[in-house]
């Protein structure tokens, strides 16, 4: 299948207005001085909420209190799958935060690393780019409630090129960071490069 290597962005007046409003609020918040300990506490609480909410979207049954307890628990204890999922997400947020401090470039390897962190504890088959389906079958995204096929993503053979296209866009575009975040999320869930963890990986990478 021939892949078209083009990412186009059309901004409406409404989108531009919203971006301007967000920039104004961000500037106001950035001018507020607070002790480092307060900043760190707010940052950690924000990452906890993200870890809970992102996994909740995927059907994780933990309450926010349970998710926070799992994150704060001794890392050497045994965790149930739902607990491991929120811990994995929190760890991935921390790793990406450190990469951002080092100004590491957005890359395909980074996407793969994040998905591996998201799927830590899962079967090896779920880690890494998805491969070919059995003859006569197509990989599809199914509705978790009805079981009906909702979307058929690109063929596995096209995934590397599509990811490279996304990486090139992120590293060369002059678009506003909010637009880049939206494109990263949209492209990753559309490409659906993995057997599992696509949504969580997309949300993590969109914040980088």
Identify what each model region corresponds to.
Residues 1-208:
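FIC/Doc superfamily catalytic core
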């Amino acid at each position: 299948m021939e892949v078209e290597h083009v990412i186009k962005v059309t901004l409406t007046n409404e989108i531009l207005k919203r971006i301007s409003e967000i920039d104004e609020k961000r500037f106001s918040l950035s001018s507020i001085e607070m002790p480092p300990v307060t900043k760190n506490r707010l940052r950690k609480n924000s990452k906890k909420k993200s870890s809970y909410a992102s996994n909740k979207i995927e059907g994780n049954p933990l309450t926010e209190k349970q998710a926070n307890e799992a994150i704060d628990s001794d890392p050497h204890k045994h965790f149930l799958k739902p607990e491991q999922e929120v811990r994995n997400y929190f760890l991935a947020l921390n790793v990406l935060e450190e990469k951002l401090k080092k100004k590491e470039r957005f890359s395909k390897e980074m996407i793969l690393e994040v998905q591996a962190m998201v799927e830590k504890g899962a079967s090896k088959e779920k880690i890494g780019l998805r491969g070919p389906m059995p003859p006569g079958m197509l990989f599809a995204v199914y509705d978790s409630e009805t079981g009906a096929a909702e979307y058929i993503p690109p063929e596995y053979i096209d995934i590397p090129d599509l990811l490279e296209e996304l990486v090139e866009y992120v590293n060369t575009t002059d678009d506003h960071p909010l637009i880049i975040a939206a494109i990263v999320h949209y492209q990753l869930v559309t490409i659906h490069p993995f057997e599992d963890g696509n949504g969580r990986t997309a949300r993590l990478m969109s914040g980088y």
